[in-house]
Amino acid sequence: MFNNKFLIMHFSIMWFRYDLRIYDNEALYESSKFSNCLPIFILDSDYLKLPTTSDFHLNFLNDSLENLNINLKKLNGKLNYYHGKTFDVFKMLFERYKIKKIFSNQVFKDLFHIQLDKNLNVLFKSANVEWIQTNQFGIQLNNMIRGEWSANWRKFSNSKTFGQPVNANYELDSSCSNKFIKKLSFAQQR
């Protein structure tokens, strides 16, 4: 059963997207500065329907998630794994936790991610949640000014790397399965 004390405590979320690593992960580093951080990964059921998804992709994803979880355990944490529509997962999390900030790294945006992020922006704003997206590639995805590309790239490539997260207080959502996609084929996931 869900514990109502979580509606009193303030939480941040570290949303792992394609950045399934501990070291040199600015979003994870920044999220670790806040108490009560919920590290999550969402396997979006609509994403599985895209033509770019395959058994190879799911196997790689599973291996990466297992490795990430092992590394989070070394920090006294655990990855909270959800399977469903990303929008619905966040709505459920907002009902269970008093979320103040969501941290993630930017992702390259195909049509699926453009629409997803647009819908999530609306949801996050309506819930008064700040979404902090860090740049993990040095590529400008927003506010692109061609004359500034070189300078911005030099600034990014000369910036410091981020080490292990600090002061981590990672939370476990007892309602999520924490079972990864191991031994499931692509056909079973669709």
Regions found by a protein language model. Give the residues of each.
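Short, Lys/Arg-enriched N-terminal segments with co-localized hydrophobic residues
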Residues: M1-I8
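Active-site "lid/cap" and pocket-lining segments within catalytic core domains
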Residues: M9-R190
